[in-house]
């Protein structure tokens, strides 16, 4: 990777930091920004990552392992060495202008949160949305940051043609748990207010209650879904925790430090979801788990979704609006 050291501080965070790692910014100029998603577990065929690494610092994040491809660690480096892809909007436009490209929803993002704190400064996600709106191309956004409300103007424009679906991730309503598990993220109250603001702006928005960790947050499923529905969410999703690669050891250390009295129970329950391991790459099972605990969690989720989201749904995309080939370049 061709990278350049730029800055060594954190700015623009929604919440106070429990720790203060000195953030380093690296620039990368990729030749490709739209990635084909081969996983049948995910609802979209393509994803796009304006950044690599994430200052949010969620201990369970499956994307931590991808930072090792850059020669960084999956631990503190993932949270404090952020790769910025400044040319992403231009590369995206080149992709959309290709005669071989056919409209298909692109997810922001796959291995990062596109509204993490550095987005305040670099505004790459906003530029990407501007490109997508110009070419009337469908996009999905998943985030746990209230910064998304900054871009309501573009999201409204996309929503007017059924070109956007937003999912706000809420793992817990317990702020004590949120602060140690997702230390540099927006509070659950801010995320619920974000859902409300987007819904009032007629932007289709749902709740992603993920990941579900038995013994930590599984019992909150009904409360989380109800709160999201009360604030205007039109649908809900859920995934089970999976701890692949280095993430497993990081989570194990975190769990033993913060919940020593419950460590064995929680760890063993996570293992029971994935055939006796915390590492699971099997399509289908990895996102839902298996066994009695997984079945109980799934039943609780389905009952809660039926109760609080009856008659609601995420509107489908309209792929016919895509301006194939475009006219004049934005750049």
List PLM regions with ranges.
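Conserved Radical SAM active-site core
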Residues: 16-52, 56-167, 171-179, 187-200
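Glycine-enriched alpha-helix->loop->beta-strand junction motifs that scaffold or abut catalytic
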Residues: 160-163, 204, 231-234
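A structural motif corresponding to the C-terminal end of an alpha-helix
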Residues: 131-137, 194-205, 273-276, 300-311
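Conserved strand-turn element in the central/C-terminal portion of the radical SAM core barrel
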Residues: 173-175, 181-184, 197-217, 240-243, ...
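Active-site glycine- and acidic-residue-rich loops that bind
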Residues: 146-149, 213-222
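Auxiliary Fe-S-binding modules of radical SAM enzymes
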Residues: 1-29, 35-36, 219-331
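Short hydrophobic alpha-helical runs that function as membrane-insertion/retention elements
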Residues: 140, 206, 236-238
């Amino acid at each position: 990777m061709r990278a350049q050291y730029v800055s060594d501080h954190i700015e623009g965070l929604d919440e106070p930091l429990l720790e203060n790692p000195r953030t380093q910014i690296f620039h990368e100029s990729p030749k490709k920004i739209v990635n084909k998603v081969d996983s049948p577990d995910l609802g979209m065929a393509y994803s796009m990552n304006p950044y690599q690494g994430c200052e949010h610092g969620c201990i369970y994040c499956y994307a931590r392992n991808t930072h090792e491809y850059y020669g960084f660690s999956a631990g503190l480096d993932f949270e404090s060495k952020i790769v910025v892809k400044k040319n992403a909007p231009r590369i995206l436009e080149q992709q959309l202008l290709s005669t071989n490209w056919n409209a298909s929803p692109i997810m922001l993002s796959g291995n990062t949160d596109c509204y993490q704190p550095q987005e305040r400064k670099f505004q790459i996600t906003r530029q990407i949305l501007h490109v997508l709106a110009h070419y009337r191309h469908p996009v999905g956004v998943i985030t746990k940051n209230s910064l998304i409300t900054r871009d309501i103007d573009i999201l409204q424009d996309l929503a007017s043609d059924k070109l956007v679906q937003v999912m706000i991730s809420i793992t817990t309503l317990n702020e004590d748990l949120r602060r140690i598990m997702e230390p540099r993220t927006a509070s659950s109250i801010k995320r619920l207010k974000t859902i409300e603001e987007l819904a009032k702006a007629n932007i289709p928005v749902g709740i992603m209650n993920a990941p579900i960790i038995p013994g930590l947050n599984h019992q909150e499923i009904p409360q989380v879904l109800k709160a999201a529905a009360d604030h205007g969410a039109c649908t809900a999703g859920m995934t089970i925790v999976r701890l692949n690669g280095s993430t497993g050891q990081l989570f194990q250390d975190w769990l033993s430090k913060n919940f020593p009295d419950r460590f064995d129970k929680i760890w063993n329950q996570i293992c029971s979801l994935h055939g006796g391991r915390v590492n699971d790459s099997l399509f289908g099972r990895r996102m839902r788990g298996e066994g009695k605990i997984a079945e109980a969690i799934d039943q609780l989720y389905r009952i809660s979704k039926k109760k609080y989201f009856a008659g609601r749904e995420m509107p489908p995309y309209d792929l016919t609006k895509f301006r194939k080939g475009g006219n004049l370049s934005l750049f």
